[in-house]
Amino acid sequence: MNKDGQDLSDIRRAMVRCQLVPRGISDGRVLEAMERVPREQFVPEHLRFEAYEDHPVPIGQGQTISQPYIVALMAEALCLKGRERVLDIGTGSGYAAAVLASLALEVFSIERIPELAAQARKNLDRTGFTQVHVKCADGTLGWPEAAPFDGICVAAGAPAVPAALKQQLAVGGRLVIPVGTEGGLQQLLCITRLSDSEYEQASYGDVRFVPLLGEEGWP
């Protein structure tokens, strides 16, 4: 319990009620996933009681996990029904992958920093999310051997949408990615593949993410 006598499950429910619902997150499956996944298991031990605060939390190696609202917003934008295969770029601590795994059939998650990839595997195994596959690689190139994906979620800001990710998106699938300046504001875009050559784009507003590094990202 924290100093006010609240346990983390109470704080998790309050996060959903006070942070997500008032900001328009309405997909019941997303709200249930956010209430069910123990975010405190995906942050450093000394930050467990900050896990549900309305801001990003540092996880080491100069990286953070996004605030709960952003994770929920990106998950909701994918419109997952439960049978999808999803690509998650920027595993971090594994938290977003766990949320996505609660909403989809299978998740493939890529992390470029070996130490974070190893810790994410431990976090996901410990919390029972065995349907998440984690590898250490350049996320801007996707996971071609596992493609196509019904959803792709990118947790880092890109200068442009990587062509490899668009190519690995199934027809009817959705790609959610922040695009904009390095270290500044980005637009959170949702790109839907309409056919082999046609895509539709919508914006979910301004966000601020760490830069997406890699061959098709920032150098």
Curated annotation (Swiss-Prot):
Entry superkingdom: Bacteria
GO terms, biological process: methylation; protein modification process; protein repair
CDD domains: AdoMet_MTases
Top EC class of this enzyme: transferase
Family annotation (InterPro entries): PCMT, SAM-dependent_MTases_sf
PROSITE patterns for this protein: PCMT (PS01279)
Record SUPFAM superfamilies: S-adenosyl-L-methionine-dependent methyltransferases
Subcellular location, record wording: Cytoplasm
PANTHER family: PROTEIN-L-ISOASPARTATE O-METHYLTRANSFERASE, PROTEIN-L-ISOASPARTATE(D-ASPARTATE) O-METHYLTRANSFERASE
Entries under HAMAP family matching the protein: PIMT
Name listed for the protein in its UniProt record: Protein-L-isoaspartate O-methyltransferase 2
